[in-house]
Amino acid sequence: MAFIRKKQQEQQLQLYSKERFSLLLLNLEEYYFEQHRANHILHKGSHHERKIRGSLKICSKSVIFEPDSISQPIIKIPLRDCIKIGKHGENGANRHFTKAKSGGISLIFSQVYFIKEHNVVAPYKIERGKMEYVFELDVPGKVEDVVETLLQLHRASCLDKLGDQTAMITAILQSRLARTSFDKNRFQNISEKLHMECKAEMVTPLVTNPGHVCITDTNLYFQPLNGYPKPVVQITLQDVRRIYKRRHGLMPLGLEVFCTEDDLCSDIYLKFYEPQDRDDLYFYIATYLEHHVAEHTAESYMLQWQRGHLSNYQYLLHLNNLADRSCNDLSQYPVFPWIIHDYSSSELDLSNPGTFRDLSKPVGALNKERLERLLTRYQEMPEPKFMYGSHYSSPGYVLFYLVRIAPEYMLCLQNGRFDNADRMFNSIAETWKNCLDGATDFKELIPEFYGDDVSFLVNSLKLDLGKRQGGQMVDDVELPPWASSPEDFLQKSKDALESNYVSEHLHEWIDLIFGYKQKGSDAVGAHNVFHPLTYEGGVDLNSIQDPDEKVAMLTQILEFGQTPKQLFVTPHPRRITPKFKSLSQTSSYNASMADSPGEESFEDLTEESKTLAWNNITKLQLHEHYKIHKEAVTGITVSRNGSSVFTTSQDSTLKMFSKESKMLQRSISFSNMALSSCLLLPGDATVITSSWDNNVYFYSIAFGRRQDTLMGHDDAVSKICWHDNRLYSASWDSTVKVWSGVPAEMPGTKRHHFDLLAELEHDVSVDTISLNAASTLLVSGTKEGTVNIWDLTTATLMHQIPCHSGIVCDTAFSPDSRHVLSTGTDGCLNVIDVQTGMLISSMTSDEPQRCFVWDGNSVLSGSQSGELLVWDLLGAKISERIQGHTGAVTCIWMNEQCSSIITGGEDRQIIFWKLQY
């Protein structure tokens, strides 16, 4: 209904809105070329002669006369039904009525349509039999040209083959476009600079309108060839918020421009004749928008949805948009799922799983008996096989739901007729039952079922939609017993869509429609295979030489529905919901979630202080800085009370700095090689450091000496972690090792027990590791850009994701353990879903990001240039750049309350940062 509201808004603002004519009066794939003011002469030459004033429209397949008086019907004469076309009075016919200056055009035909009499939207009336109509143009000098045009179009309409008809009409259209160009006088400002101009068609539901596209340094223009519905459509580039490349007829020819963030309907949809023209225009607008608008991907929206920052409804709208679904293209209208299974109860129980449809199955597989019949036919079918002959979304299905608010669109689609009364959208329950039991009915729903506008359920236009077999007239849609009104029905449908059950299972439906079960063997296994022509890449129209075959295929593509563009090729992650106590499958991943403090919803994870700190992270200010090392700082750890700061450096020293006295208290050297990281054991009695000399050193703070040395690797140790008496060490020897570290019986004595529990082998050097909150999962980053997620309960590799083009600098789990963030020398910040291993967000900076801390939504990273960058992952943007070090930021520490931050850098400094509240 978004396109209906858009049209109504435009009509309210424009003088031409009083016209009854619209492009919907044309046949599908028909063009409107020109109009002439004229009189329709009735009873020419008799005493009863009278004139009806109006406009004569010349179209590629018909002649349409729109009387000025709404009491008179619009007249549509198909050119294929014309017997003779000529100037009135030629060949002796009615010659004595023809004056020298007559502007008469005579049409003799066998069939005529009468439309919108008294401006009432109703099925077209048809009159058959040989008739002659005479139209007298206001400009007599135009008669000859108009007659010549009509004769040419008549020849095209009478060709035997549909492909030949289309080819000839296309040639006529292209000739007209070639003889015209964009009128530069239509520029908003004389100083505008023209960037490019090309031919295109403006796409609206069921119709296209050819013309010229022009883009300048400030505006995008479209000038229709026929001047309808207005001389020029103008969009200010500064107002553009979103722009998408579109498939049109499975061809890469479409471009859709939005001037709003959330509106379902765009400001203009253009179809180009050449892909290069589309790409050039897209590039120009995208370049203009680059510094004004953040670009969103399916992965970035997924992250927002998982985190609860997008509702299920909003997420589905975004996925539809990214998958080429548009309200301007009814063959690719946004598709939404049936959610509710119960349409018979008096009360709707959203706490009962039985209330809901099984979202893991396509509609065609919900009925077991029907599915068995379909599978039998599928097995017997020659290649290419398909299970369902009709699609889950098509122009017919969209208008089936919207006929009460979009009757003219239905009449356009069905050649001037409404559907049989018993086959119309009469009842929610009947429609659902037919989707379950019908032999060829597998349709899903549209966004309107989860919106706020009830008009598609109510016959507010008082349309005569026919009488059913039982004698009742088709009127408002019959609602289920649990809905007291259309408003109540939509509200409960929205509640169902946003329910916990749907939130926990919506990813299964996304897998079918937008994801990995859409194509290939996974689609076969999910009983989700449709006709090949519905899929992108199913046919190359440019390779088809037979014009009839090409037109037939294009017609099938446009009229029988198209499968959305595939957005995901791996299983879609689940949503994080407050009710998420355990996942349905049993795995170590689930065990880690059960033990994790991230078990609750994301909002429950953060205490008030953490939330306050991250909300003000962009206000970070440099408080104090100290140069305490001779080389780059590599690690920072702080005592629990915050008084002592321990740092490691490439100068091979561990240093202890007093925050209170602001003085260096100790400097310890274990070898002549760099130290790479450090951490404090619980109790603040021992510091552990890793070294490039292949060892891990234990230092007793109380006794001021090296307590123990673990010689466990064959190359430099790059990073260490500790949890629950277990040491995790990463090394350039391509391993991560897990050790048990039994505490010493007496403080200061040596640790004698370092048992190797597991060895996680890699193909290349490991540069960084991190544990999740429960220490059941470990993530490692390698020299060649691979991020690996390990299950520590079984010491097995869960996922290996090659997501960086250089060294992985740092990795960390989100507080709820559901995502991993990684940074690299390639400047990328990548977010990975732990359950599926899917890369769900990737942002890029112009320099390497060496280290970071994050809360799941925002990231504070240290860059190669010395800046601290604040990233908004959900908004996919850099929120703030904060000056700090004079060299690369190499390490960053944040306390548990997120109130204290310390960074170290290649400039040999440690910097204490202050949050401004």
Swiss-Prot record:
Reply yes or no: does the keyword tRNA-binding apply.
Answer: no
Q: Sorted alphabetically, which CDD domains does this protein's record hold?
A: Beach, WD40
Which Pfam families does the UniProt record give? Beach (PF02138), GRAM (PF02893), PH_FAN (PF25400), WD40 (PF00400)
Residues forming the GRAM domain are: 176-247
One GO biological-process annotation of the entry reads: positive regulation of amide metabolic process
The segment(s) forming the BEACH-type PH domain are 189-286
Sorted alphabetically, which keywords does the UniProt record give? Repeat, WD repeat
- Residues in BEACH domain copies: 290-575
What is this protein's tissue specificity according to the annotation? Ubiquitous.
Instruction: Name where the WD repeats lie.
Output: 628-658, 670-700, 712-740, 761-791, 803-833, 884-914
SMART domains, sorted: Beach, GRAM, WD40
May I have one GO cellular component term? cytosol
Q: What is the stated purpose of this protein?
A: Couples the p55 TNF-receptor (TNF-R55 / TNFR1) to neutral sphingomyelinase (N-SMASE). Specifically binds to the N-smase activation domain of TNF-R55. May regulate ceramide production by N-SMASE.
- Name of this protein: Protein FAN
